[in-house]
Amino acid sequence: MSGSAVVLCILDGWGNGNGDECDAIHAARKPFWESVVSGCPRSSLSASGEDVGLPAAQVGNSEVGHISLGAGRVVLQDLQRINAEIGEIHSNPYLLQFAEAIKNGRGVCHIMGLLSDGGVHGLQDHITQLARVLAELRIKVLIHAFLDGRDVSPRSAKKHVTALNDAVHSYDISIATISGRYYAMDRDHRLDRTEKAYEAIALARGPRYRDAMTAIESSYSEGISDEFLVPSVIGDYQGFSPKDGILLTNFRSDRIVQILSMILHRSQEVSNILGMVRYSEKIQVPSLFPPRNICNTLGEVVSKCGLKQLRIAETEKYAHVTFFFSGGKEEPFPGEDRVIIPSPQVSTYDLQPEMSAFPMTEVLVERIESRQYSLIVVNYANADMVGHTGNLEAVKKAISVIDACLQMVFNAAKKAGATMLITADHGNAEKMFDMRGTPFTAHTSNTVPLVLCNCDKRFGLVDGRLCDVAPTILELMEIAKPDEMTGSSLLTPE
């Protein structure tokens, strides 16, 4: 490689807003961004919808964003793939084998997943269709609903429960438990949260209500929104039986593997388990939609050139700069080092908006100054994770923290002769309220920035898509783009 070493900074949830009072990024104090970045070549990238392999108008998310950034091509995402094939799910051989085992044992099917129309981790329609197919096979279906309130409105669960009940009222299908995703979908090793969800789902332990609506209304009366609803048992549900089957409907892996692992270790008598997709190479559970092979991602190409690379993030986004950025491959490529910085142990990140950005940046600066890496990929989680809390002042502080960290990274990269490329995976923090003034905690479909700093050659940037970032980096490194990468370099000579 005769080109430049590159430091790719992914600012999770940092979208291009319109600069109004709802835009925390615009409102935050960020001297580095306004003085240095504003003078660098920059452009905008599409990070949602069909440009990242999602349905048209579907907001982007961290998994999809990192897959697109690393793959250098538009990858048909699991949501699109499942939507295209769910109509024929009744003939899926994995589902039929799963159902046959339940019928032979005279058990019931437990369906668990995110009851939401947000389409980020799961989709309510998938739960409904799978439940009806199984019920038509004369299998009793019990649903363990994970409430969202994060990728959708904070208090929208009653709408989703009503829609589910209306869709399945004529079938032998009922809700057995409900849990806020804060408990059922933790990914930060907060096992006390996962434990509460597991006990409700597997053991029928926890607050008990006659129906899901009553549980939700009780939670609202205590000022608790959907995301944080304490795992609760519905009706006379009694827990798992060894003859039962478990079907998980989330199609994104990072927030389902923790509770799945707990079920596998603590409910070993229940062996008939099926996932929507493959959740991990280390978890041997069959899936309705087996994984695709995404080869010649950015990391793989750099590795094949015999060059060293570094992936670094705090816990909340570690899977994104490793597993997802590498196209679903868990093991590091030859020459790839990984650093994980523990995320702070707080209940919600508005309580500590800086998260672990500063200690992570200290390690990052040391690694940049060592000059041993040709490619460094770092994720700053703050704008997204704090943005999801809906706390405007906390998000503004988070943005200021990122800005201070970027200044340190910029200085280190300049000293080491490395090019710094700043972008994001999707929008979030640039929209904190909706048109009614209600806190807006979901992702947006806005474009995201692409900024080129410290480049020793005179380049400009044109607008593009997330999948164009990998080809852009390869051009900076003077490495040939593989045929599999259909994205284009966004560099233009000045």
Curated annotation (Swiss-Prot):
Main enzyme class: isomerase
SUPFAM superfamilies: 2,3-Bisphosphoglycerate-independent phosphoglycerate mutase, substrate-binding domain, Alkaline phosphatase-like
GO biological process, one term: glycolytic process
CDD domains in the record: iPGM (cd16010)
NCBIfam families cross-referenced by the UniProt entry: pgm_bpd_ind
Subunit structure: Monomer.
Function: Catalyzes the interconversion of 2-phosphoglycerate and 3-phosphoglycerate.
Co-factor remark: Binds 2 manganese ions per subunit.
UniProt protein name: 2,3-bisphosphoglycerate-independent phosphoglycerate mutase
GO cellular component: cytosol
Recorded family membership: Belongs to the BPG-independent phosphoglycerate mutase family.
GO terms assigned for molecular function: manganese ion binding; phosphoglycerate mutase activity
Binding-site list for Mn(2+) 2: D12, S62, D425, H426
Reactions catalysed according to its record: (2R)-2-phosphoglycerate = (2R)-3-phosphoglycerate
Residue positions binding Mn(2+) 1: D384, H388, H443
One Pfam family here: iPGM_N
Key words, A-Z: Glycolysis, Isomerase, Manganese, Metal-binding
Assigned EC number: 5.4.2.12
